[in-house]
Amino acid sequence: MATPSDPSPAEAPAPPEVGHLIGERYQLEQCLSAPSDDAAPVQGRLWRASDQLAGGALMALRQLGPAADQEGARRRWSQLQTVLHPQVPRFGGAITAGDDLWLVREWQDGRTYQELLEARAERQLVFGGGELLLLLRQLLPVLVALHSQELVHGDLCPANLLRRDRDGQPVLLDFGLVGGGVVATAGYAPPELAQGGAAQPWMDLHALGVTALVLLSGEPPASLLDPVSLEWRWPATLDAEPELRLQLERLLQRDPASRFASAAQALAALQALPMPDSTGPVPRADRTLVLVAPAPSPLPGPVAPELPLVGLAESQPLPA
């Protein structure tokens, strides 16, 4: 039997839900993480909220429970607050509410590249070589800025890249080091990071190379990586010029002598490539498009003589 000093189930804090106010300021509007998300205990759940002290401005809140490294997250968040780049959301405060830590950042309207990839798959489309080259040229300056501050994203993948609605620019979301340790999406991190190694700038470039290969092919990383040799398979149907493919292969190199030494070096190499005329999506070359043939024209038959119309005014419709 419970004694008066024992906490009863009724006294346990209720789980957050839509409408709850966090830090007497941010009202939760929608949970954007699936309830069955296996990464939730470590990476937390993502919420959309409105700032009641800023006219209802939208914000993104990440909820980290007791299972997460909250102290490490606080330290990492304070570092990210120093990042001032137009393609990185502004990082706000860190709020403790009950057993949870809430990390606040600026909201960005747009669609993730994972969402774009899935939408195109329904239409049998993938990213074209010109479109990818443009994306890399737009995104690498962000990595140059981060790495110059000795910061690493740590979880670069299509789901953590957003195409912003207002200007079409790519925006980096959900840094993989929010919990103090590295939490990277499977398939995008090099083996050294997946095995617990320290995050390094070249690992962001590796993840960017995997992301590029996924966008070009429409296939997940597991379908593109040989599990024995750990070599990446390049489908022959990829829409990529040889010069672009060469630079993408350098992004994916694990040999320090063969890969890019920095994001700035990768950016210079990609800026030197000619931009294709087309910067839009292309059909998946490995899929057969089934085209519906037009209905055959009817065979000509005998022509009936015209008969005069009797009893119909000009404004009346002809009988069906």
Question: What is each of the regions a protein language model found here?
Answer:
Residues 94:
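Activation-segment/catalytic-loop signature of the eukaryotic protein kinase fold
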Residues 65-82:
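AlphaC helix of the eukaryotic protein kinase fold
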Residues 135-136:
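Activation segment signature within eukaryotic-like protein kinase domains
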